[in-house]
């Protein structure tokens, strides 16, 4: 086993493991989570409720009905499966799992990052409701590019911090 591990570069090992984790996530989602629907439903409904609370706190009059959030007097926004952040949560977790590091710290990065992404999705849902009330003609632009504003900075920052943290741990362990 040591000879095999030493003959594969760390990058190749990471890419192989990331591919296996991603394929496993896709199979789990397609064969178990999607048909069951409970996790998607939870993320959609709770995201709408959190967004409603946030907007109410900010002074907006909102109404929710299941997966739909509406700024009163305007069209609502429905949060469907596939738009509730679950796919991105899986990708984020896959990277953290695939990149080497101690499991205790990995668990902290996973938990913290997943919670932050979940909350960012609630903010994103609130943004959709306000944007749809204010600029409905540009809805598709906001929807298509919102991940670049709400999710990717968080994911890339946590991924970066995870790699930097592990490089420092390796330097400390080697000295």
Question: Which residues does each predicted region cover?
Answer:
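Hydrophobic N-terminal alpha-helices or hydrophobic patches in metabolic proteins across all domains
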Residues: 1-175
């Amino acid at each position: 086993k040591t000879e095999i591990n030493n003959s594969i570069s760390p990058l190749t090992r990471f890419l192989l493991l990331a591919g296996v984790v991603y394929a496993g996530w896709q199979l789990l989602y397609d064969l178990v989570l999607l048909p069951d629907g409970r996790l998607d439903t939870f993320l959609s409904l709770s995201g709408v409720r959190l967004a409603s609370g946030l907007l109410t706190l900010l002074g907006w009059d909102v109404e929710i009905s299941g997966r739909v959030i509406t700024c009163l007097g305007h069209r609502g926004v429905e949060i469907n499966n596939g738009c509730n952040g679950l796919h991105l949560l899986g990708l984020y977790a896959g990277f953290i799992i695939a990149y080497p590091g101690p499991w205790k710290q990995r668990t902290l990065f996973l938990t913290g990052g997943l919670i932050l992404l979940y909350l960012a999705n609630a903010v994103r849902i609130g943004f959709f409701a306000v944007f749809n009330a204010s600029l409905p003609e540009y809805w598709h632009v906001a929807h298509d590019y919102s991940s670049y504003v709400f999710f990717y900075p968080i994911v890339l920052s946590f991924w970066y911090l995870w790699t930097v943290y592990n490089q420092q741990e390796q330097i400390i362990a080697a000295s």
